[in-house]
Amino acid sequence: MKAKTVIHVSTECYPAAKAGGMADVVGSLPKYLKDHGWNPVIVTPRYRLPWFDKQNLRRDYAGSFGMEDDTAIFEVYRLKKGDLPFDYYCIDIPGRFDRNSIYLNESGHGYDDEAERNISFQRSVIKWLSDPKSGVTPDLIHCHDHQTGFIPFLIKNTEEGKALASIPSFYTIHNGAYNSRYSWGRIDLLPKFPSKLSQFIEWDGHIDAVATAIRYADHVNTVSPSYLEELKDQLAPLKHMMSRTPDKFSGTLNGIDPDEWNPKTDKLLSNRLTTTVDQYKKVNKAELLSELYHLNNIPLISFIGRFAHQKGADLLVPAVERVLARFGFVNFFILGSGDPFIERKVQELRDKYAERVGCFIGYNEALAHQVYASSDFIVMPSRFEPCGLNQMFAMRYGALAIARMTGGLKDTVIDFESGGLGVAFDYDSVDDLTHAMGRALHLYRDTKRYKQIRKNAMKMDFSWNQSAKQYISIYNQLIEN
């Protein structure tokens, strides 16, 4: 029986191009779809990033289309088979994606031609897939986040996309805080469609990619069940459509790659888990905190992530100071970057408590792995978290999550007092975060209980296997219907 082909359309895919968690999803889920007999194909833009320069990419297709008063040209490149565990294509659109950053210019702001970039990418994908010469025949098109949100509408309602009109579309909201919203003056960037349909791509006076996708995709999901419920109160189009067609929506937890995230085989760790968990923690902690005192006999609480309001990073410094004042017997390590004000506060915290606090401003993948391996707790005070992967990485490496109950954290971190494997708290406040870290330290003092919870946490299966089965079930329903 011929394998069914699902096309994943995304602006990110690890290891090619990564700005956030969407890249990990698009780079991991297809491996598991393939294990279950599917033929996953990934297509992204071609950026001027180091990864692309190192690859064996072959030009596979060239095309063009009219856009406003100009002609947009594009070329599709295919990665040599076997270099990734799935078929990978990237689209080169001269002047649009040949830049050193995926979304932000040198000033840290979004590109001025964001509308042209996103819409030209989507139209290139449609033009390519519509041509039998592409050699790719999809059974389903899976669109990821707002940068691809117009595709479900365009394949159903335009001459340009009519060859794909019978193919079901699936749309995933990775982070509802971001959207492609353009003024009506940009309508000519889209191919022509019946004017009576204009109302269906509009929301609040703008052309709205997320609202369009919610209306026209055959299925819409988010990256955790709880985040779907939370988004209903944040995205008016979602609430409106869910009240009319609730069966069209679902929440599916993201997963992690257990081969990449394995403390026994992790190539990024110099001290892997080869003997006892206690010994593995001890040697990693000693290496990570070589400049601090009291390395091995007191707990380590760490933070890994963006210094952003969403992540609750502004709560960290005052909460850490309170915990140090009240408990003393604890070390902290903070790894991240972002808001310059928070960066400065973290560095000041490190300087003030040089014997207790370590930090690294920036991001280093190998260091992140070592922080997980060294830590006893990972703190996640997020104000919202569509899914969250850090708590999964942490448990895999023997660190319990101290997490605020929002989004995917609510689905994966249950408080230890309720029989769970983490420390949960409810409010995005310094008081609640401080109290949660205090509870974690009391748990750590109960050595027998802590080690049993840690042992159970390390056995948790957060692999993509279960999530892939849920995706496949929905894929099959859409194709059959």
Q: Where do the PLM segments sit?
A:
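Catalytic cores of nucleotide-sugar-dependent glycosyltransferases that transfer UDP/GDP/TDP-activated
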Residues: 1-481
